[in-house]
């Protein structure tokens, strides 16, 4: 699936209603704003999600028909991680599953949820059963990160005439919300081999700074 380069209309009749169509739609709820792109939009030089994020989308969805190939999954995860980090947003990716595979084209049923570059949840690849993955995306953290990112604000000012269409909508929320995410009580202290890597990096940074000072002393 790819987005149309030029649409002859901004609206389409669907289920007896006239609804907007395009890659520039923002869906606003009382809690957050989200945008949608399709499949290879993510692979483009400037994905539609970039513009949507700059115009207020805090969560980005990608409905995909992404077939499998050797090494492709790692590249896909890298793309989603980078795009969610670059947009300072949550990114939810859902692709075709086993029921749509053939002998020539195979779909692994990739389901991925990222937040600002970090993986929150993923489905089991090549499962022969339907799957549902769930996670919470911290939209308040996303807003805070965007406020302190001067480059993000500068990009917002340079959007030009790329104007999104806002659509008021609402989520059907359950009365009880059970958190699935686990938060480290000591988030700034990594564990295992990562601790050694961070300590070595801190040491190298300090040494480089002191060495430069000694050169000019």
Regions found by a protein language model. Name each.
Residues 1-217:
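Enzyme catalytic cores with a strong preference for nitrogen-chemistry domains
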């Amino acid at each position: 699936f790819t987005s149309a380069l030029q649409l002859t209309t901004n609206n389409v009749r669907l289920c007896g209603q006239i609804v907007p169509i395009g890659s520039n739609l923002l869906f606003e709820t009382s809690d957050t704003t989200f945008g949608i792109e399709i499949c290879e939009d993510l692979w483009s030089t400037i994905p539609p999600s970039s513009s949507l994020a700059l115009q207020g989308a805090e969560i980005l969805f990608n409905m995909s028909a992404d077939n499998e190939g050797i090494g492709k999954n790692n590249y896909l995860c890298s793309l989603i991680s980078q795009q969610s980090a670059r947009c300072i947003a949550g990114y939810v990716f859902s692709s075709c599953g086993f029921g749509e595979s053939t002998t020539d084209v195979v779909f692994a049923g990739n389901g991925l949820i990222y937040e600002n570059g970090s993986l929150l949840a993923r489905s089991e690849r090549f499962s022969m059963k339907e799957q549902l993955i769930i996670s919470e995306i911290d939209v308040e953290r996303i807003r805070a990160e965007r406020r302190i990112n001067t480059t993000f604000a500068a990009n917002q000012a340079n959007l030009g005439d790329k104007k999104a269409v806002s659509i008021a909508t609402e989520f059907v929320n359950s009365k009880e919300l059970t958190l699935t995410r686990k938060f480290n009580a000591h988030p700034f202290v990594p564990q295992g081999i990562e601790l050694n890597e961070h300590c070595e990096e801190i040491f190298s940074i300090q040494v480089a700074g002191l060495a430069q000072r000694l050169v000019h002393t």
